[in-house]
């Protein structure tokens, strides 16, 4: 894997925004060690714009940053989960043939976006919950409850915030593709 300088900078910016935005002071506590983070929209945006590799690395590194600064210790299981979420949402440009880059974002694209957000959260944080149970002997009922709350909450958050961001991004891209040079 050979990443360009631009891609490395994008990953660093995305991870910093996701990591700092994921701190408890910016989240909404909903369950034991479970916080809904508006920063999930940042992860989704970087994943949609730059694809699965960037999405994975922004999620993985960003969650690591959150854990380092939050003071609750580094939970590699949940760090991996955030990486998987970013990777799955990062499939969006591939599945939509990069239509958003030419200013197209319709209901079908939004549906794909929401499904990827849900599937990403279920698989990503489902992996985290499973690994917590196996590696750390966390109670299954607790991690399953965390998974359900996170998957539902994050999907709604990503869908609502993502809709406005991606709709406006598509409008902006559409306007910039119709520019003509003054005569």
Swiss-Prot record:
Domain of life: Bacteria
Chief location of this protein within or outside the cell: membrane
Stretch forming the signal peptide: none
GO cellular component: a single term: plasma membrane
Membrane protein topology class: Multi-pass membrane protein
Annotated keywords: Cell membrane, Membrane, Transmembrane, Transmembrane helix
Protein location: Cell membrane
Residues annotated as transmembrane: 8-28, 41-61, 74-94, 110-130, 147-167
Positions of disulphide bridges: none
Pfam families attached to this UniProt entry: ECF-ribofla_trS
Listed HAMAP family: UPF0397
Family listed: Belongs to the UPF0397 family.
Protein name in UniProt: UPF0397 protein VSAL_I1988
